[in-house]
Amino acid sequence: PNEVCTQLHKCQLQQKPRWNRTPLRRRVYSTLRYTENVMAGRLFESARRQMLHLTEPFSTAQELTANGPKADVYMTGSDQVWGPMEDGSYDPVYRLTFAPEGAKKVAYAASFGCTELSKPLRGQFCRDLRQYATITVREDSAIALLHQLGLEGKQVIDPVFLPDDAFWQSLLEPINAAPGSYFLVYQIHKDPALCAYAKAAAKAAGKPLLRLSASVYQATWGGKFIYAPTPGQFLHYIKNAACVITDSF
């Protein structure tokens, strides 16, 4: 069977710098975020376990190298798997450095999340990606980066476009919103201009604005707030929306 290797990078366990200055700030931040993290995390983890074959979790590259999954093919992808982590570092695990020597490695729709790499990083990426049997990437800029590294790759579509409509329909879960009856905003970054635009667009169309988020603080950003929908509900809200406004593709 296909398995998804689950690794938790150390920087994902760190608090944001603004809240990491003193023990009191860390305590306040943890208290504020605990409930929403637990609820959203449970929904996400439940969906992952239902839809994916997961390995046991690994927290270090050493654990992966010593006890990683045995497979015929190791695949990287998709999205910004070769981009920087939250702390700015680049994790070589996403270049499959833990795989046994001689293992077949491939990448599907991988992305660098940037258009340039520093000289030291170019050396690391060149060394590791040369071990891949096949590399496919998502963006024009990723093809250009591969060429800078002296590597060849093919451009492919994001895997979200591979399944047919029936597949996505099968994932839908019931929601209390009629098709075409609302505008939907899904927002990642705090941007007052986008908030204002979404509210104005919905008002001009004479439709209510719904806002989906797993972050409680977005309840003050405008629109009817819908907290932490399940993946199936999330898809259904997008499908039924008259218009979707977002800063995330």
Predicted regions and their residues:
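Aromatic- and Gly/Pro-rich donor/ligand-binding loops
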Residues: 2-127, 174
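An anion/phosphate-binding loop that grips the pyrophosphate of nucleotide cofactors and donors
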Residues: 71, 132, 241
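Catalytic donor nucleotide-activated moiety binding site of glycosyltransferases and closely related
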Residues: 104-114, 142-145, 187-189, 193-231
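A conserved, positively charged/aromatic
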Residues: 126-131, 238
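A short beta-strand/loop micro-motif in the catalytic core of glycosyltransferases
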Residues: 132-139, 244-245
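Donor nucleotide-activated moiety binding/catalytic core segment of transferases
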Residues: 153-161, 165, 214-247
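A short helix/loop element that forms part of the nucleotide-sugar donor recognition site in Leloir-type
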Residues: 167-177
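Conserved donor-binding/catalytic core segment of Leloir-type glycosyltransferases
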Residues: 176-189
